[in-house]
Amino acid sequence: MKTIEGKVLNGFGKLVGSGIVLDDDGVLVELCPVSDDIHGWITPGLIDIHCHGGGGASFPDDPNDAGIETAIRTHQKCGTSGMLASLVSMVDPVPAIEALVPWCEKGELLGIHLEGPYISPHKCGAQNPAAVRNPDMEELRAWLEAGRGWIRTMTIAPEVENAQEAAELLLEFGAVPSWGHTSALGAQALERLRATAESGSARSFGRPAQTATHLFNAMPPLAHREPGPVREFIQAARRGECVVELVADAVHLHPDLVSDVTEYVGASPAGELGVVFVTDAMAGAGMADGDYELGGLPVTIVDGVARLTEGGAIAGGTARLSDEIKRMVTCGATTMEQAVRACVAAPAAALGIDSSACGVTIEWTVGERPSFIHFTDELDVAEVWREGETIR
């Protein structure tokens, strides 16, 4: 038997115990009753639904077993027990999709995220503009079929031609559109949000069937005469019609903004799970400063910030989700409970992932092998367990 003490939170951020007891096979035997004077935290393993890589490898640039495993392990050992593999705008993503599917099938990945290529050429960010184009339904269907049900979401600009048709096709395959990399006016974003929320396919999901890709980044800023898509995404999340991603690393977004959005959206019962923290991590996550690559574009990391070597646009993140929790909670932007909810229950709900998926623990269930993190009082990662096995 092994007892680990700490304030135990479930995936919704609710305090449910003061420690856990595991048997020799990593099976949960009991939750210790809530009590005072307990140090540290125990949370379910984190879920990252927007991650391009780490450890020197990326899913779009290294679609081979060695590269894929390196990226996965870099995040797993820091407590991300479930993750999507995010691609970028590519001329032909099929080889990368086909390389990732086996890793989904054996439970190392929760699915695949296509970030592009159906995005605004004016808001490429760190995407390759040569690969950006308007949606083609025959092409998209071929990608979805290659994904064998593992493509869970795709970033599309709401204003591009055939955006709604692409969204409907994604929903038909059980994937959700993620609006982003956009130059849309607020009215255009609202039209797409409403059309998707009211579609028959979306209604059958029983949950918000759309997300917003890294809110604020790669989209027009909130302005006093044209609020743009940012306001519409936030309001839709508060209504329970959308889920917004925040790259809560204190680089992509100021912590005060993370706090404001989390509080505003979460203040509505419909928006309780409306905010998701993501890393948008690239190959340099968990690595030293230096030169890397994202989607074939050179990237330079200086002081932990990744930027395109030419042009200087932010080119993904270098944090892991456990880093984001520490940064946001330590500076007071969120509570521990809010941060855990945004890293566990909210991402799982956004994509319809439940506790039967490998690496996913939402509630602590006696008799099951949990995936979890043991944090110190300072929110450093002390231990990581996945499916009842210690990996750190």
Where does each model-flagged region fall?
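Divalent metal-dependent hydrolysis catalytic cores, especially in the metallo-beta-lactamase
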Residues: H52-G54, S58, I68-V94, E108-S120, ...
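Divalent metal-binding pocket/active-site signature
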Residues: L114, H122-P229
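Generic structural signal for well-ordered alpha-helices
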Residues: A71-I72, V94-V101, L140, L144, ...
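Divalent metal-coordination and catalytic microenvironments
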Residues: G6, G26, H39, H50, ...
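Active-site-adjacent C-terminal substructures of enzyme catalytic domains
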Residues: A187-R194, S199-C343, A350-D354, F375-L379
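N-terminal helical capping/dimerization or prosegment-like subdomains
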Residues: G13-L31
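Acidic, glycine-enriched loop/beta-strand segments at the rims
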Residues: L9-S18, G332-V340, A349-E387
